[in-house]
Amino acid sequence: MVVLSLPYPISTNRYWRTFRNRQIVSKEAVAYKARVAAIAAENGIKPTGKAVSLTVQLIPKANKDGTASKVCLDLDNCLKVCLDALQGAAYENDNQVEEIHAKRLKTPIAGGGLVVKVEELE
């Protein structure tokens, strides 16, 4: 089992861009995926080829006064970005994900975040 503390994900609305009538991954998405890969590498995590279960906790961003920001990603919005970012860092392909448990936490932190637990399945 591996637990990763990741930065607050970008919105799926900013994940794709249209360029010359083609959909491409945005620079923001590429940068987020690179940050996730770097965090995984720093923690000695290598991609597994086995089926996995994910537990995802979305931590809301805090306002300056410490209250939770009203601008918060939908939980399903954050999952797509999270799954794509972990591909190649925690598992080889996102079709290996057989279970997903997701929850939005109530207590905000500065900048928000994402805590992901990756467990190999038998």
Residue ranges, per PLM feature:
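Acidic, proline/glycine-enriched N-terminal capping motif
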Residues: 1-122
